[in-house]
Structures are given as C-alpha cells and as structure tokens.
Amino acid sequence: MKETLAVINQMQAEGVIGRYAIGGAVGATFYLEPSATLDIDIFVALENPQGSSLVTLAPVYDYLRSRGFKSEEEHVIIEGWPVQFLPATGTLEEEALEQAVETEVEGARTRVMTGEHLVAIALRTGRAKDFARILQFVESGVLDAARLDSILKQHGLVEKWEQFEVKFLRGNL
C-alpha cells in the first residue's frame, strides 16, 4: 500500500486533488481487525471546474491514465491496489476530511477518517456490509459515543441510528 499512497500523495502535492482521507473498509482497519476488502476508498476534496456547479473526477483519471495506470470499472489500479476516488460532496464527508487523523502506513504519510465519521457515513450508505462494519465498531468499544452522537445530530442521522439500534442492538448489549 505504501507505493499506492505515494502516488496519491504526489497527486495532492501537484494539486490534482485537495485534501484526502482513507475511508470505507480499509479506513476501518485502522480501528478494527482487518477484513476482506477489494479496494481502497479515497475521499477527496475537488474543485469545481470554472463556471460549473458539477464536481468531476476527470482530472484524477486523466492524471493517472497519463502515468500508465489502468481503470477497471469504478477503480483505478494504482501499484496493485484498486482505488476508488469519491468526491467529498456533502457536509458529512467534508467534515470527515477536515477531522481526519494523520498517520503512517509502511512509512507513507496519509490521513484516515475518524471511526465516528466512518460509522456515520456507513449508516447513511446503509448497505448490509455497512451495517456489519458499524456493529464491529460498536462491539470493539473504540468509538467516542458523545462524538458520534454529535456527528449524527449535526448531519440528520439520529433517526437512522435509532432504527439501526432497534434492528441490530436491542437486546444485544
């Protein structure tokens, strides 16, 4: 993963992407036991093209393609790792980028979303694998409950959390 992160850090240094943070299942491995995952989710801050209200990943893909990296579906294979770039288009993702934690992976500097932001994004996404990851976080005891509660309130996710609790946590704690 070191080489993959080196490419992403170079993209940031050259202004192709703004601030970034690792999210998804790989982000969760910084807090939980590693799980099988196929890709690295990289949430990125992107500038809108001048005169447009749309955010585009075209500069990211153009940059990587010009350096010989190949696309496979929604991923770009960077030094052996499938990477999915996800624009931070909402306030939750933007906050997650702002509050991401700096760390090192195999000597490469990077940023990873906080566990609480990973849970909030997974809750909003709402797939079965997201709920399973949330359960792992809850059972691990690594979450700051007050911080998670604040994030859920700020981003209108309290009702979804309550539904999650009823479905998955009632009687299990």
Stretches found by the model and what they are:
Residues M1-L173:
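Compositionally biased terminal segments of proteins
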